[in-house]
């Protein structure tokens, strides 16, 4: 088994030809684009040939040209191998939030599965259909701050081949949404799926060029039984194809580039779509010493995105004040000063004063409403009940104040649970004075669609909280404490726009020992939402989420601090 680009063995990752064999190949082409005024050059893979449509019949193999406007979520991964300012194309990827890119794990690891230094030497290029930006330096390039692997990537088996990159700045291009956990409709055998990429336009290892423009390819999905029989036989490795972790597609390689339809080296990390959702990531396929792809009778393998959705979704929406993957706390005393307390996992760092005055607000919760990687605040003004979105941008650390709702003085609860209707944008919930649970679907820019009544009877709950997924199914949930009994209830998310929550079920009894529940998100960084609770004596506790929607929903509490009764607002 080998990384695509080194023709050894019969199982190959679909990396760009030449990238993994730097010691064997030399030189680079001169197509460049500039970013951040640092003088970087963006180039196709070292030693790789590039062909333009005027010199070829456009194809991945059997594909067609596509414009950036029809695939605005498509990005390129670049890597600086020699600390010389030259960043070479390695893989494709998908923008799944303004500051998040989904790709293949083998695109951000070496041949042994060791993570590459994508933070120090990697970059993402977006906004162009041209390979490495083309001769006119098209596109926008941004750095990378974090890499996340959903599952344990197995380099030998090319298993769990999915990664998520966090960008240093948000991009303004339209993101795509991954297929949800449990989605079966989009994976039916025979369904026609569309794949994108800049990969090789022929199957010959030595003479086939990469495309200089983005291409698309339609292929029928195959059943797991077909995939296992076809691919295990093709690579002579029983169990090479792993149902549940992988899918496969294709008409069956023809061995002839004029009649074949296949993904090839250079297409790695790029998305496969069905009905507007990313269902797969180009991963691997059979190869020989002479043929890089389109092997007679064989299919192409892709990572099954829906399987990993519940792991990657908490990382797509993991914005915090410290800009790591752990949720922090915001609090203020009876004065005007706000403070942030950054999570260190199972403890909180010393508080830091947060710019601005907050004495005018009687409710403050945190969220990233526009998914730009900078934490926002939702704050209700005491005197008027008006609700404001306090947000900053990549170009300014000053928080702007935007009114988003008026006259919410009698609203019982305001919640920012994240995306509840499965459209990729963080929403706002409100419990009215009469107990109606209202969902305000967000456009992601401080504006909202018409409110939807999701439930009634919520006046019986004295606290309504939620941020993220407490049941590890990829859907955001709510926690409710009932007045009188102080029992804790869970309302599981459904991901449906008309009925986004199930009927609440009791998960804990008599929580009267706590006078405040806070749901900032994933505090300890394990991709499961947690709960922070303040006791009546002022002690603050972390209750780590377990992902179970039962009485075992939280692990044993861990004390975070004392004296928290001095804080007026915690969010």
For each feature predicted by the language model, list its residue ranges.
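Conserved H-D interstitial segment of serine endopeptidase catalytic domains
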Residues: 78-80, 101-104, 109-152
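Structural detector of coil-to-beta-strand junctions
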Residues: 72-76, 90-92, 247, 263, ...
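Acidic glycine-/aspartate-rich tracts in secreted/extracellular proteins
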Residues: 80-82, 106-109, 127-132, 168-173, ...
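Trp/Gly-enriched beta-strand/coil motifs that build multi-repeat beta-propeller-like domains
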Residues: 317-571
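Chymotrypsin/trypsin-fold serine protease catalytic domain
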Residues: 130-133, 141-143, 156-255
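Extracellular/periplasmic catalytic domains that process cell-envelope and extracellular macromolecules
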Residues: 66-70, 95-96, 116-118, 155-159, ...
């Amino acid at each position: 088994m080998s990384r695509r680009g080194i023709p050894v063995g019969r199982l190959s990752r679909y990396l760009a030809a030449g990238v993994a064999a730097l010691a064997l190949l030399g030189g680079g082409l001169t197509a460049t684009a500039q970013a951040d005024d640092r003088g970087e050059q963006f180039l196709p893979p070292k030693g790789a040939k590039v062909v333009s449509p005027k010199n070829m019949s456009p194809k991945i193999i059997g594909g067609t040209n596509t414009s950036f406007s029809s695939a605005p979520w498509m990005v390129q991964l670049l890597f600086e191998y020699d600390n010389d300012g030259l960043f070479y194309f390695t893989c494709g990827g998908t923008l799944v939030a303004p500051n998040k890119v989904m790709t293949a794990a083998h695109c951000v690891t070496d041949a042994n599965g060791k993570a590459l230094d994508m933070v120090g030497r990697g970059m993402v290029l977006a906004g162009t259909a041209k390979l490495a930006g083309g001769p006119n330096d098209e596109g926008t390039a941004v750095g990378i701050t974090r890499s996340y692997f959903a599952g344990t990537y197995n380099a030998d088996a090319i298993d769990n081949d999915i990664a998520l990159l966090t960008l240093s700045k948000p991009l303004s291009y339209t993101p795509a949404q991954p297929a949800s956990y449990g989605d079966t409709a989009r994976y039916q055998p025979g369904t026609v799926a569309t794949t994108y990429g800049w990969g090789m336009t022929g199957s010959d290892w030595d003479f086939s060029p990469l495309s200089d423009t983005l291409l698309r390819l339609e292929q029928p999905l195959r059943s797991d039984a077909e995939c296992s029989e076809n691919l295990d036989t093709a690579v002579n490795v029983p169990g090479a194809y792993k149902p549940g972790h992988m899918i496969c597609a294709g008409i069956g390689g023809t061995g002839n580039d004029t009649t074949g339809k296949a993904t090839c080296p250079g297409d790695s990390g790029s998305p496969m779509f069905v009905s507007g959702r990313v269902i797969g990531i180009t991963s691997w396929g059979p190869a020989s010493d002479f043929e890089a792809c389109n092997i007679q009778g064989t299919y192409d393998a892709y990572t099954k995105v829906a399987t990993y959705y519940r792991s990657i979704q908490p990382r797509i929406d993991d914005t915090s004040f410290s800009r790591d993957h752990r949720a922090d706390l915001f609090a203020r005393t009876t004065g005007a000063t706000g403070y942030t307390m950054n999570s260190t996992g199972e403890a909180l760092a010393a508080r830091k004063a947060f710019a601005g005055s907050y004495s005018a607000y009687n409710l403050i919760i945190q969220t990233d409403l526009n998914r730009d990687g900078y934490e926002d605040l939702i704050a209700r003004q005491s005197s008027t009940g008006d609700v404001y979105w306090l947000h900053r941008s990549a170009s300014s650390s000053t928080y702007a104040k935007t009114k988003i709702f008026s006259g919410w003085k009698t609203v019982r609860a305001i919640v920012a649970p994240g995306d509840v209707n499965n459209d990729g944008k963080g929403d706002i919930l409100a419990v009215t004075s009469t107990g109606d649970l209202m969902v305000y679907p967000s456009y992601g820019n401080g504006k909202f669609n018409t409110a939807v009544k999701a439930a009634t009877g919520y006046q019986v709950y004295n606290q309504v909280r939620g941020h993220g997924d407490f049941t590890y199914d990829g859907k955001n949930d709510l926690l409710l404490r009932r007045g009188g009994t102080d029992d804790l209830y869970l309302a599981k998310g459904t991901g449906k726009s008309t009925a986004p929550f199930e009927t609440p079920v009791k998960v804990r009894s008599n929580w009267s020992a706590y006078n405040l529940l806070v749901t900032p998100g994933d505090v300890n960084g394990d991709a499961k939402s947690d709960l922070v609770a303040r006791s009546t004596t002022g002690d603050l506790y972390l209750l780590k989420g377990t992902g179970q929607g039962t009485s075992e929903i939280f692990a044993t509490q861990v004390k975070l601090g004392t004296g928290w009764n001095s804080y007026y607002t915690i969010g």
